[in-house]
């Protein structure tokens, strides 16, 4: 987990189906609500379809980056916990190029996966609350993360991106995706151009508190393995390797 950073640059080395199968064979043991396993994976090989996905991805990438350039978290809910309307002019954003080696060359990644989910199989226990729903993701994104962890264990690198979900309705016909299936993520895999760097993240005491949200931070006690990680050369806390 400490060495499974987002990888967006890959060599041209092909990934055989046998290796991809092995990656997914391990990833399938992810948890899901009621063990319903409502996911399916589309392995995109057709060159024309890959270019179509790239073109749609670029449009959503422009929307995403318009938020970033405005100093905003893309499509984030407001302080009341709900999303009301776009915070930027999306029509204008789609017309402004946002150069990205990954987005502009998406059709060339060795493995291009579209992870989809049957919405009727998600136990969305926060439905009806007066805030953005998040619980449904617990039944699909552990599987997506398992794909990355499994790939990493087999010498591959990868990245998950949800930007493509903005284009779900446009892609539904070309993917032959029926309702109530939805796009959960796009996953790119391959052999990394550069060695995967060690990750940096916030320390445990920065996000873990005792008894209540304003409680004291949890700190390592005697004999904690925290010091061992430092001795092994792990980087200090930070926010590197954020995903899109």
Regions found by a protein language model. Give the residues of each.
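Generic N-terminal amphipathic, Lys/Arg-enriched alpha-helix
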Residues: 1-13
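C-terminal helix-cap and adjacent tail motif
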Residues: 6-7, 76-86, 182-244
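Short catalytic-loop micro-motif centered on adjacent basic/acidic residues
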Residues: 9-10, 40, 157-161
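Small-aliphatic-rich amphipathic alpha-helix that forms the alpha element of a beta-alpha
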Residues: 22-28, 111-174
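A generic local secondary-structure boundary/capping motif
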Residues: 29, 101-104, 173-177
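Glycine-rich phosphate/pyrophosphate-binding beta-alpha loops
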Residues: 29-35
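Short, surface-exposed beta-edge/turn micro-motifs
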Residues: 38-39, 109-112, 183-184
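Glycine/small-residue-rich phosphate/adenosyl-binding loop
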Residues: 43-137
């Amino acid at each position: 987990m400490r060495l499974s950073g987002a990888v967006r640059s890959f060599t041209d080395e092909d990934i055989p189906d046998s290796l991809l199968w092995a990656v997914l064979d391990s990833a399938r043991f992810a948890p899901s609500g009621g063990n319903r396993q409502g996911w399916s994976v589309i392995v995109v090989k057709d060159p024309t379809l890959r270019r179509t996905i790239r073109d749609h991805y670029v449009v959503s990438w422009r929307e995403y980056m318009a938020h970033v350039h405005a100093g905003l978290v893309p499509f984030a809910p407001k302080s009341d916990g709900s999303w009301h309307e776009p915070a930027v002019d999306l029509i204008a954003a789609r017309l402004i190029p946002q150069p990205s080696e990954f987005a502009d060359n998406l059709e060339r990644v060795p493995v291009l996966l579209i992870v989809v989910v049957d919405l009727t199989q998600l136990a969305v226990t926060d439905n009806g609350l007066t805030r953005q729903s998040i619980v449904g993701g617990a039944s699909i994104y552990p599987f997506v993360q398992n794909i990355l962890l499994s790939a990493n264990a087999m010498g591959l690198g990868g990245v998950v991106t949800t930007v493509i979900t903005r284009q779900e309705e446009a892609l539904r016909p070309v993917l032959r995706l029926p309702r109530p299936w939805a796009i959960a993520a796009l996953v790119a895999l391959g052999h990394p151009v550069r060695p995967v760097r060690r990750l940096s993240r916030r320390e445990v005491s920065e996000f873990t508190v005792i008894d209540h949200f304003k409680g004291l931070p949890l700190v390592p006690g005697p004999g904690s393995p925290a010091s061992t990680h430092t001795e092994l050369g792990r980087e200090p806390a930070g926010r590197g390797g954020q995903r899109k």
